[in-house]
Amino acid sequence: LRDAGVAASDLSAVAVTVGPGLSMCLRVGVVAAQDVCAQHNIPIVPVHHMEAHGLVARLAGGTERVKFPFLALLVSGGHNQLILTRGVGDHVILGSTLDDALGEAYDKTARLLGLDVGGGGGPALEALAVEGDENAYKFPVPLRRRKNCDFSYAGLKTAVRLAVERDLGVPEGDAAFTAVCAPGQVPRPEHARVLTEAGMSDEAVEARHKTKADIAASFQKAAVKHLEERTKRAVEWAGDVLNEGEGTRGMASLSCIVVAGGVAANATVRESLSAVASDAGLPLVTPPAKWCTDNGVMVAWAGVERLALGLAEEPPAPWLGGDGDGKDGGERREVPLLPRWPLGSRDERATGETKSSKKKGMAAPLTPAGGEASDLVAPGIP
């Protein structure tokens, strides 16, 4: 606000993520947002984290270009989802991860290879893959026999681990790391590299680096191919959903494919999905890299879209009773946290997430099951 030259009293509302996520983390943001809203008597706009990832493409690409409906591929460390977005708060889940998300697979593979993951495992592995031969290892493309839009990376991760153990001889177990760890230091994959490469000739170290690059490139080829195949099918499924009503065949169509989330910053992912979009006759929209990872801009933009539709809550009272600090029996009226909050109803052809299949504690979807195509389009926002 200081950099923008805007005072808190000038704000029209405050948007804040209320789910999904860890309750402790969500609460920090919600409490701060409520304080500002209560102090300045302005509305608070609850935002779904994954919807924010998808909607920010409308800020990046322009609302005239990224019109509803569009297909969104949300790829991050914790999520892989293919979403038909028909409007603000109107989403159909066509596919999601059955176990591990792509971002997690990138991170774990980078660690297996002993890369420096201080700047993120994904960027480190992508940089190494440029030096490798993507055809050196025939890693399996996941779920090719399942004709749906779901994702799975657990099997691919296992194949990579076996290749690393076979061809790089990385020691197993914490005991192998302790020889190069300082007292009390947590063992990390790079310690295995130090231990294994100790005493090697320069030629051997170089050959070892080439093997790592080949594994990285081959992993990336299989991982991204999985994204390609699922996205191609999702384009078809989205068309089915949009035209499933009697007399609607051919009446509705996608405006574009949106790729968002942290992994969307990967250049190989963007290049591959550009080809998928081109084959489908659709533009591909990817937010700038700085808006692909978790950021405040995407939450603010989702707030703008929801506020324009009247999807906001009244300013919260500072405290109900007590002296205002909440420590003497006063109770605060708080915006509910929704740590387990599905983005929308699930297409009947989608398998769904087995990793989080328990229904206990699950909030109602942002988009109710059986919901009609949304009329929630803000005035002036196509």
Model-assigned labels for residue ranges:
Residues L1-Q34:
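Short beta-strand-loop/turn "lid" adjacent to the catalytic site in phosphate-handling enzymes
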Residues L1-S12, T231-S255:
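Phosphate/pyrophosphate-binding loops at sites that engage ATP/ADP/AMP, CoA/4′-phosphopantetheine
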Residues A15-T17, H48, L71-S76, I83-T85, ...:
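Short beta-strand segments
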Residues I42, P46-L71, A302:
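Conserved phosphate-binding catalytic cores of ATP/NTP-utilizing and phosphoryl-transfer enzymes
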Residues P46-V47, S255-C256, L273-V299, P315-W319:
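Conserved phosphate-binding/catalytic loops in two-lobed NTP-binding clefts
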Residues R65-F68, L74-V75, Q81-T211, S274, ...:
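A short helix-loop
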Residues K212-V224, E228-T231:
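Activation-segment/catalytic-loop signature of the eukaryotic protein kinase fold
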Residues L254-L273:
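Glycine-rich phosphate-binding loops at beta-strand->alpha-helix junctions
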